[in-house]
């Protein structure tokens, strides 16, 4: 039986590690060569991804708050721009954009022929609606639906393919907020049956069981390799391990090294850093931590590598701040 396409993220930085894997089974994951080993990707097939939480949050991309739900919806929705694998903002629903000399007006040119999953073509009106919706302050609240949009002064459709977004003052981080999902202006069921422009379209959600999506054939960009992805809801990480070994799921993330060690030898495990920092924060206003020498003594006394060896089999990176190593731009001069 083929050795299945495998695993994904690892987790970590300071103290805990996360490992994922994928085991034998009958479904073809569509991402391995003819010999069953990882190689040139092959279009088609399906996978089942195990997750240790129910997606019981709203599926509306502007209202969901759970990180796990956002990870899934990232496949369904896109903004005017989106991050690439290096974290750089690249065009998505927008083909390009320009920034005014004073840094307060972003002018986006929409990509030709981008379609929503319901078959409608994305228009400037949809973009204006989406951004205004994020910037609006819901009744009874003090902040916009999306807090980062509090700086938006106006959103205007200059023509059928051009939208101008003006903010109160220059903010070089604002372009990253334009990853907010573009949604149809006339669609009202986002919370339960989401419609976006991403490479996968929503199929179904069964509470406490699964979330299913399939490749969107009219996607504007490179088509997804897989025909179908099912997220299977598991009770906890131990249940993920059991389902992996049993063959009912093909892939998962966020296991500890101890849990990963329970996987059989047919699994391939990949690991890498993510945005998780485990730290002890001290109250500098309380004695004896108001003394800098005491704080320094604690730092010197703690065996950080020993902690990582004990709880994470040596995985992780000792850091000197709450900024995780993968956030490389922070460390640029």
Residues of each region from the PLM?
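Ligand-site clamp/hinge motif
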Residues: 217-261
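Alpha-helical secondary-structure segments
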Residues: 48, 123-130, 160-164, 198-199, ...
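Short, low-complexity disordered leader/linker segments with a strong preference
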Residues: 1-46, 61, 88, 133, ...
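Gly/Pro-rich hinge or "lid" segments in bacterial periplasmic/extracellular proteins
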Residues: 85-88, 167, 171-228, 236-238
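Surface-exposed binding/hinge segments that line
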Residues: 98, 102, 143-186
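N-terminal lobe/hinge region of extracytoplasmic solute-binding protein
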Residues: 50-101, 132, 195
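Structural transition elements
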Residues: 5, 317-333
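Aromatic- and charge-enriched surface segment that lines or borders ligand/interaction sites
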Residues: 95-139, 288
